[in-house]
Structures are given as structure tokens and as C-alpha cells.
Design a protein with these regions (language model features):
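Membrane-integral, polyisoprenol-dependent glycosyltransferases
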Residues: 1, 41, 100, 106, ...
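Start-transfer (signal-anchor) and selected internal transmembrane alpha helices
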Residues: 1-41
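Transmembrane-helix motifs of polytopic, lipid-linked glycan transferases
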Residues: 11-19, 117-144, 174-175
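Intramembrane catalytic core of multi-pass membrane enzymes that act on lipidic substrates
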Residues: 25-127
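Transmembrane-helix signature of polytopic, membrane-embedded enzymes
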Residues: 25-30, 137-158, 187-188
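Transmembrane helix irregularities
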Residues: 41-46, 155, 201-207
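Multi-pass, polyprenyl lipid-linked donor-dependent membrane glycosyltransferases
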Residues: 124-129, 148-179, 183-184, 206
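Short hydrophobic alpha-helices at membrane interfaces in multi-pass membrane enzymes
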Residues: 150, 179, 183-201
């Protein structure tokens, strides 16, 4: 399995390099939006981190402290959401910042006791963040570079598998960092500095 994974990674890197050499044009917005919607039809894969996110959000909305209480200890290990967490994270309290934990709580509030619905609500946030990075980069970079954005981010196999389809929290942190850069680019002066500071703080409060 490890060998296959490394082969896939090498192929992805080669594909990105070849894509950059072709000087590609930008992809129409309907493509990434459609891809994002399709990603919601399948559960995240590659790791069980999305189950951790669901559990910490569940603990938060139920009045607990996800930074001090472990998933396995919550609800005597019988809670339909927290009991789904996989080893070795069953005994680990949250290591995530307050902002992203609030987002996890929002997903948990939407899904209630339905694990798939909680995870899907989280996936919606990931899709929005993934699209947000694309929008932010297009805002900062000249139009001639928009095709490169799609090669390096939107259609990058590593980003798609780990960030989008894996539903990792890093996608949200990345979106916030890009938003900070876009704010400085869009609003020079005090407004941009303040906005960038807010987005940077939120990124730091994610992971």
C-alpha cells in the first residue's frame, strides 16, 4: 500500500510539472464548483481525521470542553458521534484552535446524532474553503497566471485527495492565510492591514 501511495504521489508531481510547462488557461468556474459538489457524495478518505473533527464539535455543542475531554470518555463511550473516532485519537482531547473548533461545532449542530450528516456539513465547509483559496489567488495574481492556480491548487492531485476529498482542516487554514494576503492586496492601508490581521489570527486559531 505504501508503495502504491508513493507511486501515486510521484505521478501527481510529474503531472503538475507537465501542466505548468504547458502554460494552461484557467478552468471555468462551473468545473471546480461541480467537482466540489461531487466530493460531497462520498465520505472523506485517507485518514479518520474527519471523525475527530465531528467528535470535538459534538463535545462542544453538548456543553463539554473538547480541549480537556477525550472522545472515548464523552458519554461513557456510547455517544453515536464521539464513539466513532479511530485509534490512536480516541483518548486525545482536541489539538485544534478555537475558530476551527467553532466550525466543527457548527457541523455537529447541523448533523446532530447522524454521523454522516455531521461529516457532510464539515465537507461543505471544506469545499467552500477550497473554492475560496482559488478565488483569493485569482484576486491577487494577474489573469495570465490564473491557469497556474488551477494546476497548483484547484486540480492538483495532492490537494484534491488530501485537502478536498480528505476533508482536512488544513484546507480551511490555507483559505484564511490566502484571505489575509488578498486583503492586503485589495485594500492597501489600514483597512487591509486590519483585515489581514483578523484572517491571520483566525488561521492561527485553526491549527
Amino acid at each position: 500500500t505504501t508503495g502504491v501511495l508513493w507511486i501515486a504521489i510521484v505521478c501527481a508531481v510529474v503531472g503538475v510539472v507537465l501542466g505548468l510547462r504547458q502554460r494552461p488557461g484557467p478552468v471555468a468556474w462551473w468545473g471546480p464548483i461541480g467537482l466540489g459538489l461531487l466530493s460531497l457524495l462520498a465520505a472523506p478518505f485517507g485518514s479518520g481525521d474527519h471523525l475527530n473533527y465531528a467528535a470535538y464539535g459534538r463535545i462542544l455543542v453538548e456543553g463539554g470542553d473538547p480541549w480537556s475531554e477525550s472522545p472515548i470518555a464523552w458519554g461513557n463511550g456510547l455517544d453515536p458521534i464521539t464513539s466513532a473516532v479511530e485509534a490512536p485519537w480516541t483518548t486525545e482531547p482536541s489539538v485544534y484552535g478555537p475558530f476551527v473548533t467553532l466550525l466543527q461545532g457548527g457541523a455537529a449542530a447541523v448533523g446532530g446524532t447522524d454521523l454522516r450528516l455531521v461529516v457532510m456539513a464539515w465537507q461543505v465547509l471544506i469545499v467552500l474553503a477550497w473554492l475560496g483559496v482559488r478565488a483569493g489567488l485569482r484576486m491577487v495574481l494577474d489573469r495570465e497566471h490564473h491557469g497556474r492556480i488551477d494546476v497548483l491548487w484547484t486540480l492538483n492531485p495532492l490537494v484534491l485527495t488530501i485537502g478536498l476529498l480528505g476533508a482536512h482542516v488544513d484546507t480551511i487554514a490555507t483559505a484564511l492565510v490566502v484571505a489575509a494576503v488578498a486583503a492586503l492586496s485589495r485594500w492597501p492601508g489600514p483597512v487591509g492591514i486590519v483585515a489581514a490581521g483578523v484572517f491571520t489570527g483566525l488561521a492561527a486559531g485553526s491549527k
